[in-house]
Curated annotation (Swiss-Prot):
GO cellular component, one term: extracellular region
Misc: There are 73 peroxidase genes in A.thaliana.
Binding-site residues, Ca(2+) 1: 73, 76, 78, 80, 82
Catalytic activity field: 2 a phenolic donor + H2O2 = 2 a phenolic radical donor + 2 H2O
Entry EC no(s): 1.11.1.7
Compartmental location: Secreted
Pfam families hit by this protein: peroxidase
UniProt-annotated binding residues for substrate: 167
Name of the protein this chain belongs to: Peroxidase 56
Domain of life: Eukaryota
Length: 329
C-alpha cells in the first residue's frame, strides 16, 4: 500500500511539473507552427528569402508594399490570401479603394512559381505573404522573427470587406483601438504595427483634408506641426491625386524607430499617426521608443507581426492550397 501511495504521489508530482512547464512553453495557434514545411518542403523558406532579397536589392522601395500587403490581407477575412484573388467582375479586394495602391503582386507570383516547381501543392499563398513580409524587413536590415506557417488559402474575396475592415489613415484613436481589438490586437500592437510607417510612401489624397479643410473652414489640422504643414502644402495641391510622399522623410527606405520621433514632433503624415498621441497608453509607447536604440521596437514588431499573422487563419482541411495565388483551384 505504501508503495502504491508513493507511486501515485510521484505521478501527481510529475503531472504538476508537466503542467507548469507547459504553461511556459510557446504555444501554436490554430494549427500554426514554426517550421511547418520542414519535412514536406524543406527548402521553402530559403526559396522565399532568396526571391525577396533579390527583389529588394533591385528596388528597396518594394519592401514597404510587401509588408503592407500582408497587413491588408490579415485585416480582411484573416490571413488567408484573399487580397491576392482576382475576379472577372473586378469585385475583389484588390479593387477596393484602400488596396488600389498595393503593389508587388508579381513578386508573390514569382515566389509561388518557384515553390510550385520545388514542391507542387504544398506551400499556401497565405504563408507566402507571411514569409515575404518578414524577409522584406530583414532585407532592409530591419527586424526578424520566426514566422508561424501552416495557413491554408481562402476561397472568397469581396470588394466591400476591405473598406469595412481596414483601418483608415483618417481614423481617430478610438476607432483605431476598436478595430485592432476586434482582430485580437491590443493598444501596444496598434502602436508597434503603426511603426511600419517608418518605411514607404503615402499619397496626397490621404492628407489633403488635414492640409486644407480639416474642420470644414479651410484650415489645417491643429495637431500637425505648422512648419511641416507648410512643406506638405508645397508638395500637395488640393486637387493632387498622384504625388507620393515619404512617410518618414529622409529615412523611408530604412526600417528604424525614427517614425516615433516624427509622431512625437507632430509630424506623422496621417491623421491616424497623430492619433497615437491622443491616448495615454499609446502615447507612452511612442515616447518610450524614442529612448531606445531600436532594439525594443524591433523585438516588439516581431511579436506583433506574429500575433497579426494568427488572425482568422484557415488550417487543417479548411480552405485549400492554391496552385496560383490570383485564382482558386
Amino acid at each position: 500500500m505504501a508503495a502504491l501511495k508513493m507511486t501515485i504521489s510521484c505521478f501527481l508530482f510529475l503531472q504538476v511539473i508537466y503542467c507548469l512547464l507547459s504553461s511556459f512553453a510557446p504555444t501554436n495557434v490554430q494549427g500554426l507552427k514554426v517550421g511547418f514545411y520542414d519535412k514536406a518542403c524543406p527548402k521553402a523558406e530559403l526559396i522565399v528569402k532568396k526571391s525577396v532579397f533579390e527583389a529588394v536589392k533591385n528596388d528597396r522601395t518594394i519592401a514597404a508594399p510587401l509588408l503592407r500587403m500582408f497587413f491588408h490581407d490579415c485585416f480582411v477575412r484573416g490571413c488567408e490570401g484573399s487580397v491576392l484573388l482576382e475576379l472577372k467582375n473586378k469585385k475583389d479586394e484588390k479593387n477596393s479603394i484602400p488596396n488600389l495602391t498595393l503593389r508587388g503582386f508579381e513578386i508573390i507570383d514569382n515566389v509561388k512559381a518557384a515553390l510550385e516547381k520545388e514542391c507542387p501543392g504544398i506551400v499556401s499563398c497565405s504563408d507566402v505573404l507571411a514569409l515575404v513580409a518578414r524577409d522584406a524587413m530583414v532585407a532592409l536590415n530591419g527586424p526578424s522573427w520566426e514566422v508561424e506557417t501552416g495557413r491554408r488559402d481562402g476561397l472568397v474575396t469581396n470588394i466591400t470587406e476591405a473598406l469595412l475592415n481596414l483601418p483608415s489613415p483618417f481614423n481617430n484613436i478610438s476607432s483605431l483601438i476598436t478595430q485592432f481589438q476586434s482582430k485580437g490586437l491590443d493598444k501596444k500592437d496598434l502602436v508597434v504595427l503603426s511603426g511600419g510607417h517608418t518605411i514607404g510612401n503615402g499619397h496626397c489624397p490621404q492628407i489633403t483634408n488635414r492640409l486644407y479643410n480639416f474642420t470644414g473652414k479651410g484650415d489645417s489640422d491643429p495637431n500637425l506641426d505648422t512648419e511641416y504643414a507648410v512643406k506638405l502644402r508645397g508638395k500637395c495641391k488640393p486637387t493632387d491625386t498622384t504625388t507620393a510622399l515619404e512617410m518618414d522623410p529622409g529615412s523611408f527606405k530604412t526600417f528604424d524607430e525614427s517614425y516615433f520621433k516624427l509622431v512625437s514632433q507632430r509630424r506623422g503624415l496621417f491623421q491616424s499617426d497623430a492619433a497615437l498621441l491622443d491616448n495615454q497608453e499609446t502615447k507612452s509607447y511612442v515616447l518610450k521608443s524614442l529612448n531606445s536604440d531600436g532594439s525594443t521596437f524591433f523585438k516588439d514588431f516581431g511579436v506583433s507581426m506574429v500575433k497579426m499573422g494568427r488572425i482568422g487563419v484557415l488550417t487543417g482541411q479548411v480552405g485549400e492550397v492554391r496552385k496560383k495565388c490570383r485564382m482558386v483551384n
